């Protein structure tokens, strides 16, 4: 009698999951937002991971874990995209300090260098929007690779401006 032994299936591995929480991730994409799409795509990875760190990449990164991936599910689902920008580099560094494991980044930007995994979300399109508002102050952000025109109305006056990338 001959027995054939299959290679054992690959076991899930520990994981550092960095999720972009910048304002651009709140952009509509299909029936939800880019962040919703990112959550949907990375949730299976997180749920299977025996140990994970989840890092919200906002202006100041915020980490959860290390913990079993399934224990971080609610934290992932509760993430919001509201920061003016996401500091992916700082978020990746924080995750690596907390857990020595492959890093997967979910973002609507290009793949960051030096990570083991990338989950890209969002259609490639020009993105112009308000990134900060205060009394007497308005900041516009341009995610395109070229200057874009904008029109802003303040106190009944209309201003046309060119917003650099």
Where is each model-derived feature located?
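N-linked glycosylation sequons
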Residues: 1-165
């Amino acid at each position: 009698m001959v027995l054939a032994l299959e290679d054992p299936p690959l076991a899930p591995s520990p994981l550092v999951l960095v999720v972009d929480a910048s304002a651009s991730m709140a952009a509509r994409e299909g029936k939800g937002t880019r962040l919703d799409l990112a959550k949907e795509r990375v949730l299976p990875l997180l749920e299977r991971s025996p140990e994970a760190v989840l890092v919200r990449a906002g202006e100041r990164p915020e980490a959860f874990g290390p913990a079993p991936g399934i224990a971080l599910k609610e934290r992932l689902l509760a993430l919001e995209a509201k920061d003016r920008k996401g500091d992916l580099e700082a978020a990746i560094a924080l995750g690596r300090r907390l857990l020595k494991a492959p890093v997967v980044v979910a973002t609507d930007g290009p793949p960051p260098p030096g990570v083991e995994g990338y989950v890209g979300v969002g259609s490639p399109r020009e993105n112009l929007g308000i990134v900060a508002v205060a009394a007497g102050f308005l900041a516009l952000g341009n995610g395109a690779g070229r200057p874009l025109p904008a029109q802003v109305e303040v106190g009944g006056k209309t201003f046309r401006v060119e917003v650099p990338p």
